[in-house]
Design a protein with these regions (language model features):
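Short S/T/G/P-rich N-terminal loop/turn motif that feeds into the first structured element of a domain
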Residues: 1-86
Length: 86
């Protein structure tokens, strides 16, 4: 089965930055326990613009992790499946 991915974009103000970084750390810990890989990237030219990536080995694992997440994903039903390029 193909890997599954969801993406979320978040904008934070300079005053929210430290609190948001702590939130990202909590997300990383939670998703690691749920067997989901989590990454966060900040746009180089726009501080405070973040992309969060959630990847699991299958859509079911990803959906289950999102359903139990302490911080809900804005659109957990928008799931991308890996394209097999052979």
């Amino acid at each position: 089965m193909a890997r599954a991915l969801t993406i979320q974009r978040t904008l934070v103000t300079p005053g929210e930055r430290d609190r948001f970084h702590e939130k990202l750390r909590r997300k990383q810990e939670y998703y690691a326990r749920e067997k989901v890989r989590f990454w966060a990237f900040e746009e180089a030219g726009l501080p405070g613009a973040f992309l969060e990536f959630f990847e699991a080995d299958d859509p079911k694992t990803l959906a289950r992790a999102h359903a139990g997440a302490p911080d809900p994903v804005i659109d957990p039903n928008r799931v991308y499946k890996e394209v097999e390029l052979k």
